[in-house]
A protein has these predicted regions:
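Mixed-charge (Asp/Glu-Lys/Arg
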Residues: 1-160
Length: 160
């Protein structure tokens, strides 16, 4: 079984908004430490669609991009800009989840750059940006598998 993201029902007039909302609802259902507070943002969003503020005041943030194929140069630039903005506007960020409705290709073919290779390069760059601001941020990926695994849980029945 799988999710056909092309059939995602629009929310507030667009599939992109629907994808953001699904990602935020799944983020809201994560289990942070007791005493944490969940915040859903509207646009403009300072680089995150939603985030958790934990009792130690650190933050976990989520960014959703409704890209149905591996990101091209312009799309990577959009993700990079979101990361830069988040690092600037959320200085207590400790975890950042990028959500795309696709899994990362990883054929490991010499002299070729695939999605996983580019992801790893960008994470290394983002970690450098965070380090330059004296931040330690864990960058995570929620793709089709991670999203479907969460949507398949009984408590999320009917969200898609």
């Amino acid at each position: 079984m799988s999710v056909n993201w092309l059939n995602l029902r629009p929310f507030n007039g667009s599939q992109h908004a629907a994808f953001e909302e699904i990602c935020c609802q799944l983020a809201a259902a994560e289990t942070p430490p007791p005493g944490s507070q969940f915040i859903r943002k509207g646009a403009p969003d300072a680089g995150v669609e939603c985030y958790w503020t934990l009792p130690d005041e650190s933050e976990w943030g989520w960014q959703a991009k409704f890209f149905l194929s591996p990101p091209n140069g312009n799309q990577w630039a959009q993700i990079d800009q979101s990361v830069k903005t988040t690092l600037e506007k959320h200085p207590r960020l400790s975890q950042y989840v990028v959500c795309l409705p696709i899994d990362r290709q990883d054929p490991r073919i010499d002299n070729q750059q695939w999605f996983m290779d580019k992801w790893n390069e960008h994470v290394q760059q983002w970690e450098g940006w965070a380090s330059a601001k004296d931040m330690a941020v864990v960058f995570e990926y929620w793709g089709a598998h991670e999203l479907f695994a969460r949507l398949s849980r009984e408590e999320h029945r009917g969200r898609y």
